[in-house]
Amino acid sequence: MTETLLAGRLDLPFLSGGGQVGEMMRAHDWEGSPLGHPASWPQSLRSVVGLLLNSKFPMFVAWGEELGFLYNDAYAEILGAKHPAALGGHFREIWAEIWDDIWPLIRTAMAGEASYHENLRLIVSRKDYDEEAWFTFSYSPVRAEDGTVAGMFCAVHETTQLVLAERRVSGERQRLVDLFQQAPTFMAMLSGPDHRIEMANPGYMTWWAIARCSVEQSQRPCLTPWPRVI
């Protein structure tokens, strides 16, 4: 076995690289961790850890009955103030505030079934206060050498900024619609060379109906009517 301890740091091939978190793993005191010493980790766990440490995408693995927690640099940003204390800790203690929300998903993964969740809203506490956050992620079972499920792997992308941006755009559009609807005179928004009506208030539609009716009654040639409101 080539696994040795150099200058207080583990020299284990599967722990190579990994940026700041990789360096922390190599220097970590694993006594008391539910994961035990890395030299005793099974090959299945070593493979997952080697993968996540050398990925730029946020990832973590929870292992064993106590769900010992390991992650990479990208996921450390999601943890916020929970990092670095979360390294090697218990999954349930790290994310205690959302445990009731995610435990059914974890249980499903530990039963051998993967799952995918898009823009899941959670109330997290990672900056010394509670905040809304949204995540798109997958939970996948990880099997030990004997084929039993020994842990779960997660690849996750925080979508909070995207969700909030979509909310702002939706809110701004609704304010514009309200402005149109409440305008004391007729108002419309047209687009393109055909003057397609993008938005119009009741006053405008009433005026347009009257104007069109007047043209038809006069039997004069009429310009091509504007396309319907979309």
For the regions a language model picked out, list residue spans one by one.
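Sensory coupling linkers of modular signal transduction proteins
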Residues: 143-146, 150-177
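PAS-family sensory/regulatory domains
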Residues: 27-35, 77, 81, 85-100, ...
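Per-ARNT-Sim (PAS) sensory domains and their PAS-associated C-terminal
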Residues: 6, 39, 43, 97-101, ...
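PAS/LOV sensory domain surfaces, especially short acidic/polar patches at coil-to-helix junctions
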Residues: 65-77, 81, 194, 198-209
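PAS/LOV and related PAS-like sensory modules
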Residues: 3-27, 43-57, 169-195, 202, ...
